[in-house]
Curated annotation (Swiss-Prot):
SUPFAM superfamilies: HD-domain/PDEase-like (SSF109604). It catalyses: tRNA(Gly) + glycine + ATP = glycyl-tRNA(Gly) + AMP + diphosphate. Its EC number is 6.1.1.14. This is Glycine--tRNA ligase beta subunit.
Length: 688
């Protein structure tokens, strides 16, 4: 079948930069989905995104839907004709619905009899007649939280739409999208190239847009250009550019034709902690900082302009002029903050509520101080340092710098603590208390910092659950899911010997009579353990493996993790499926047992199969106990996997629920002991 390339470009006003890539990829995915639903064959869908446009290009799109052969079965021949051989009303009605006469119907013979049948070929629709509807639906399905109207139009979109370009090969697809008639016109750069021009063919996009309109429509091309040029510019200055993926994509979304330039600021600003300078450069100005080979900030930065004059000096001067007041503010705040010690800011924490029912930030720091000390004692950290860091943990929130540059909380506490002469472990803990801040973030380095980070997060979890405000649906205003996962990561990855039930109980006690939820400890522990599921699923671990461990509810996260790893390994063994099925059978038998179950008595065994299993179970009971104590659950399950043959032989040749009570009790005891061996690791019966 003949194919053509299809272009759809939606020309808009400036789109939200942080949402641009998501909108573009969703547009392409939706178009692909609509094409598939329409039965239109194509090779691939490419997407393009720039500040004032979203576009897709469908390569190798068929010019029509394929023809379909349909078969509509009618009544049985025996019911289609009367005794005289005339068509019945049922047959005539069916034929009329097919647009034929009964005489034109074909016959279909099956093993159940002969039937009337109508076979026809339905020609597919032309692609050009379907494209407007496909694009309309694809745009309607975009993830746009807030839409807007413009002019006197009733249509709504993320930003006002000015042009719609729909080309199927060289043909213009006429129609209306979002209240705008389609055409061949595309708009160029606001200041460079041609303001607007026409395309003769879909294949001219995006190259002609770059040549005549000075717009690089390919998002990934712009991104790669910015990244490569920024690195070159930084190297020329003897440094390395700090280019985070999120900021790189935001900057890519802000420019149509990137021009990467460098500028500088006064060296005196380097006396201010680098984090504060970087915060304003990245967050406010969308600049890329430059560091030397030792990781020290250089007095230079990289920015990306959307215009490309022959002499860029005025643009460079303008950016230097814009950033100078922000850096001056940071310098002033820093110098002012140094005049007062962190500890002297404690009284001001009494004026700030953490949560109305849970008290002030000063109340919270007192709880963190106490809980950090408890945790430190259990993990081998310095209690005095942990408590000191807990006491000072929120003091930097009262500084000018953090008030103005909120994302510097923690790191400014570290710098101020160093200036105050606090111990280095204490200072570092003030910064690392917030780690991990996001998925994949680094963890606190020292055990002192781990103590404070855990204390802070568990205090928040316990307090909010304690007043009955656990997360509902997607709402999570206190970021409790992130806090819970952060605790699990710290405990598991640092292999800390902490029991959640114990720590949460201690945290609960520190609230005094403020908490109203009597089940707070169990609810917090269950909530935290529940976070394991998302973590392990992201690693590709099967859900039933996680559920098998959750069924046992081990409350030590490091122990929980060891069990999951062991069961995940066990699941790969040849005997795993049979043993899981056997455990299900054992569970069902024991659940129906109506007599007391004692210990195994080898002397009561009658059948060789039951004696063999009993001996194997008793032998393994002794062998696995040291391994259980060591937490070597993989070795435990490897040993238990050897029970497959004696278990199979037992169920093949032994009846458990016999009339003779002593024999029945002993056989139930064998199964109970067997079950308990597995349950010391996980509930294997849950495995699918």
């Amino acid at each position: 079948m003949t194919t053509q390339n299809f272009l759809a470009e939606i020309g808009t006003e400036e789109l939200p930069p942080k949402a641009l890539k998501k909108l573009a990829t969703a547009f392409a995915e939706n178009v692909e989905q609509e094409l598939n639903q329409a039965g239109l064959a194509f090779e691939k869908v490419e997407w393009f995104a720039a500040p004032r446009r979203l576009a897709v290009k469908v390569l190798g799109l068929a010019e029509a839907q394929p023809s379909k052969q349909v078969e509509k079965r009618g009544p049985a021949v025996s019911a289609a004709f009367d005794a005289e051989g005339k068509p019945t009303k049922a047959a005539e009605g069916w034929a009329r619905g097919c647009g034929i006469t009964v005489e034109q119907a074909e016959r279909l013979s099956t093993d159940k009899g002969e039937w009337l049948v109508h076979r026809a070929v339905i020609e597919g629709q032309l692609t050009k007649n379907l494209l407007v509807g496909i694009i309309d639906k694809a745009l309607a399905g975009l993830p746009i939280p807030k839409t807007m109207r413009w002019g006197d139009k009733t249509e709504q979109f993320v930003r006002p739409v000015h042009t719609v370009t729909l080309l199927f090969g060289a043909d213009l697809i006429e129609g209306e999208i979002l209240g705008v008639a389609s055409g061949r016109t595309v708009r160029g750069h606001r200041f460079l190239g041609e303001r607007e021009f026409s395309l003769d063919h879909a294949d001219q996009y995006p190259q002609l847009l770059k040549e005549r309109g000075s717009v690089v429509a390919d998002f990934n091309e712009r991104k790669a250009l910015i990244l490569a040029t920024s690195r070159e510019k930084a190297t020329a200055l003897g440094g390395v550019a700090d280019i985070e993926e999120e900021l790189l994509e935001e900057v890519t979304s802000l420019v149509e034709y990137p021009n990467v330039l460098t500028a500088k600021f006064e060296e005196r600003f380097l006396a201010v902690p680098a984090e504060a300078l970087v915060y304003t450069m990245k967050g406010d100005q969308k600049y890329f900082p430059i560091y030397d080979k030792d990781g020290k900030l250089l007095p230079h930065f990289i920015f990306v302009s959307n215009i490309n004059p022959d002499d860029p000096s005025k643009i460079i001067e303008g950016n230097e002029k814009v950033v100078r007041p922000r850096l001056t503010d940071a310098e002033f705040f820093f110098k002012t903050d140094l005049k007062q010690k962190l500890e002297d800011r404690l009284p001001r924490l009494e004026t700030v509520l953490f949560q109305q029912q849970l008290g002030t930030l000063r109340d919270k720091t007192a709880r963190i101080e106490a809980l950090a000390g408890e945790i430190a004692a259990q993990i081998g950290a310095d209690q005095t340092k942990a408590k000191r860091a807990g006491l000072l943990s929120k003091c930097d929130l009262m500084t000018n710098m953090v008030f103005e540059f909120t994302d510097t909380q923690g790191v400014m506490g570290m710098h101020y603590a160093r200036h105050d002469g606090e111990d280095e472990d204490v200072a570092v803990a003030l910064n690392e208390q917030y780690m991990p801040r996001f998925a994949g973030d680094t963890l606190p380095n020292s055990l002192v910092a781990c103590s404070v980070a855990l204390a802070d997060k568990i205090d928040t979890l316990t307090g909010i659950f304690g007043i009955g405000q656990s997360p509902k649906g997607s709402a999570d205003p206190f970021a409790l899911r992130r806090a819970a996962l952060g605790c699990l990561r710290i405990i598991v990855e640092k292999n800390l010997p902490l029991d959640l039930a114990d720590i949460v109980a201690k945290a609960t006690a520190l609230f005094g009579d403020k908490l109203t939820n009597k089940n707070v400890v169990d609810e917090v522990v269950d909530f935290m353990l529940g976070r394991f599921r998302a973590w392990y699923e992201s690693e590709g671990i099967a859900v039933d493996v996680i559920q098998s461990v959750l069924a046992r509810r081990p409350t030590k996260p490091a122990d929980f993790d060891a069990r999951v790893r062991a069961v995940s390994h066990f699941r790969t063994l040849d005997s795993a499926e049979a043993l899981a099925a056997a455990n299900k059978r054992v569970s069902n038998i024991l659940a129906k047992a109506d007599i007391a179950i004692g210990e195994i008595d080898l002397g009561v065994c009658v059948e060789s199969a039951e004696k063999t299993l009993a001996e194997a179970v008793l032998a393994l009971k002794g062998e696995v106990q040291p391994l259980i104590a060591q937490g070597d659950y993989t070795a435990v399950l490897d040993k238990l996997a050897n029970l497959r043959q004696p278990i199979d032989a037992f169920f093949d040749g032994v009846m458990v629920n016999v009339e003779e009570q002593t024999l029945r009790q002993n056989r139930l005891a064998i199964l109970s002991t067997l079950q308990n061996l597995f349950l010391q690791v996980a509930d294997i019966s849950v495995l699918q």
